[in-house]
């Protein structure tokens, strides 16, 4: 939502479903740190998502080839729910390694350097949750860009924590019926709501009904 709260406003009532590429990357992630058997992973993937496009088996092979170029820590826990009652947020950690480091899985390619803003926000939200649950400071977490076989550590910065809090305020405002203003760096050129947005930005929900 932090990239463009207006888009979040329009999408807030739409059903959320994972992409086919994510289904592949997610299933592969359970095997990181162990030999990656394409056939085993594919059979698991279609068992979870029976309607998956068969051509994505080629995508799985590309992901495996990329991941085989690096070293990965095997997970001792997967799909761990985390909660912050203070902030009213709930999240999911995809993988936790034996040394306590946590990771989230992405089906996107990696940036040349660093991590995407949305990924930094998610890591920061998880850090808030873990700190409340454990009472210990959380330095950061890893983002695993499966298609490129890249794992990037993001150390949570004060600006990330401020962004989380600001985003939660925007979320609350939208739930109260306010139409948010789009930010200066909003990705309007590739947004499917561009025309709708330009005609209604700045109005309240009550004015649109």
Label every model-predicted segment.
Residues 1-101, 209:
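Metal-dependent nuclease catalytic cores that hydrolyze phosphodiester bonds in DNA/RNA
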Residues 102-106, 142-144:
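Glycine- and acidic-rich phosphate- and metal-coordinating loops
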Residues 15, 128-133:
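Active-site catalytic microenvironments for nucleophilic, acid-base chemistry
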